[in-house]
Amino acid sequence: MSGPNPRGAAVAALVRQEQDGFSNLILDAELRRQKLEGRDKAFASAIFYTVLEHQGTLDYILSQFLPKGLAKLDPQVREILRAALAQARYMQVPASAAVNEAVKLTRTFRKASASGLVNAVLRRAIGYDLGSAVFADEVERLMVLGSAGRDVAVFLHEHYPDEALDILTHTADGGLTSLRANPLKGTPEALCEKLLALSLIHI
C-alpha cells in the first residue's frame, strides 16, 4: 500500500485479528507499521472497531447476497466487504465512496479478480432492509440485530426476554445499562458471575 491508507490499515488489522485475536494489540501494530497519524489513524480505528462491534449484523446482511457464504471468501475480501458495509451503515460514509474505495482495496490487496463481486454485493447489501428480515427464532433475531454471540443471546433471551435487544443495542451505542437480578432465579452475585463468564460485563 503506497501512502497513508486508513481503510487498508483497518482491513489488514481485521484480517490479522480474525486469525490471531488480541484486537487492540493488532490494530496498534498496524497503525504503527503504516505510520498513520491524526485523522487517518482515527478513521482506521473507527472502521476496525465498528466492524467488530457490529460483525454479527454485517455478516448476516452480506450473507444474503453471497450464495456460498462469507466463509468461502478470501480473508482479505471478507474484511473489505465488512469494512465497507460498516462505513456505509454505521459511519455516515456515502455509499458510493464506501463501494468505490472497497473496489480499490481489492487491487491493493492483490484480489482484483474479486472487484466485481465486491462491487455487486455491496451495492445490494448497503440498501438491505433489516426490518424485512425473517428470523428462525428470537435467539437468531438477537444475534443479528444485537450482533451478539449465541451464548449471550440465549442467556439474555432466557433471563430478560423483554429487554434483551435493548440491552444489546444500548451497550453497542455506548450507553449505560442497569440490570436487576430476579430473586426467584438467583442472587445478584450468581448473575454477575454468569455475565462475567459471557464477557457481557467487565470489572
Predicted regions and their residues:
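Class I Rossmann-like S-adenosyl-L-methionine
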Residues: 1-200
